[in-house]
């Protein structure tokens, strides 16, 4: 009798809990995709999709957005123009992630009326309807205006994205909402004369507050040192880190060959 009760309880709990776990897996899991690698159009705009060569329809993958800078385009992110291809993240993913590089409107991310957020929402729906994605493991990164767009995602889609990495960003794509916690990494040059360093601190401070971190001074490297200093905030509900480096408004902090931003971003994403 006791055995029967325990078995019934176990089965009841299994039925109750299974949808919770299933929610993390996208509708594309277990299906053969109708979407291939390459350029796709949606709602009159384009994005580039890169799926691992060993893709398994039954395995859930990370989903990573790489957002280009002002005057750039998705091809610059894919090929690596002034940056490592895919901001250096595809190499570090080792086949564990699906990558998306969208094209901004008029070579930027003004996000007027939330149109760029809506564009990324549509991409997510299309990609996840075709491929197996862990919906609790979406990420975004970008430089300059791409950083501003990553920040806008952190503001309005904190519940849909796990973490963002903002490279020399500014408040240039808006911040609708902006009250929810999300894992937030900022990387900013102390000599940035386009989107000033202090502005990057202000962006990060929103998530220091949202994530209920203990306040801390942002540490900086010495000018001319060609080095970086990292500040990890403590007591956060979700991690917040700020990397200050000796440089300006650079798509690739400390140079294209430097592993600083790619390593820090990928490790931060995986630890978030």
UniProtKB/Swiss-Prot annotation:
Source organism (scientific name): Aspergillus clavatus (strain ATCC 1007 / CBS 513.65 / DSM 816 / NCTC 3887 / NRRL 1 / QM 1276 / 107)
According to the UniProt record, one GO cellular component term is: extracellular region
Q: What is its EC number?
A: 3.1.1.73
**Function statement:** Involved in degradation of plant cell walls. Hydrolyzes the feruloyl-arabinose ester bond in arabinoxylans, and the feruloyl-galactose ester bond in pectin. Active against paranitrophenyl-acetate, methyl ferulate and wheat arabinoxylan.
Which gene holds the coding sequence for this protein? faeC-2
**Any GO molecular function:** feruloyl esterase activity
Q: What is its main location?
A: secreted
Task: Provide the residues annotated with a glycan attachment (glycosylation).
Answer: 34
Q: Which UniProt keywords apply?
A: Carbohydrate metabolism, Glycoprotein, Hydrolase, Polysaccharide degradation, Secreted, Signal, Xylan degradation
Name this polypeptide is given: Probable feruloyl esterase C
Q: Name one GO biological process term.
A: xylan catabolic process
Localization, UniProt: Secreted
Reactions performed catalytically: feruloyl-polysaccharide + H2O = ferulate + polysaccharide
Read off the InterPro entries from this record.
Answer: AB_hydrolase_fold, FaeB/C/D, PLipase/COase/thioEstase
Protein family according to the UniProt entry? Belongs to the faeC family.
In this record, what's one Pfam family? Abhydrolase_2
- From which residue to which does the signal peptide run? 1-22
């Amino acid at each position: 009798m006791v055995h029967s009760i325990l078995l019934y309880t176990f089965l009841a709990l299994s039925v109750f809990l299974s949808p919770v776990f299933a929610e993390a897996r996208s509708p594309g899991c277990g299906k053969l995709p109708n979407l291939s690698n390459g350029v796709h159009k949606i709602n009159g705009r384009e994005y580039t999709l890169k799926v691992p060569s060993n893709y398994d329809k039954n395995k859930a993958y990370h989903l990573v957005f790489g957002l280009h800078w002002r005057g750039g385009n998705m091809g610059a992110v894919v090929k690596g123009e002034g940056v490592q291809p895919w901001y250096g993240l595809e190499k570090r993913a080792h086949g564990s992630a699906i990558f998306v590089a969208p094209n901004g409107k008029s070579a930027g991310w003004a996000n007027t009326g939330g149109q760029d957020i809506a564009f990324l929402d549509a991409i997510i729906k299309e990609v996840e309807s075709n491929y197996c994605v862990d919906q609790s493991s979406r990420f975004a990164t970008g430089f300059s205006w791409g950083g501003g767009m990553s920040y806008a995602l952190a503001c309005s889609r904190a519940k849909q994205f796990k973490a963002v990495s903002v490279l020399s960003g500014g408040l240039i794509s808006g911040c609708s909402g902006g009250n929810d916690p999300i894992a937030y990494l900022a990387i900013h040059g102390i000599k940035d004369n386009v989107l000033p360093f202090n502005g990057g601190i202000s962006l990060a401070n929103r998530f220091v507050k949202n994530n209920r971190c203990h306040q801390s001074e942002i540490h900086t490297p010495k000018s001319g040192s060609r080095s970086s200093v990292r500040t990890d905030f403590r007591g956060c509900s979700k991690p917040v880190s700020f990397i200050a480096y000796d440089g300006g408004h650079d798509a690739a902090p400390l140079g294209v060959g430097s592993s600083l931003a790619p390593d820090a971003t990928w490790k931060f994403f995986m630890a978030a």
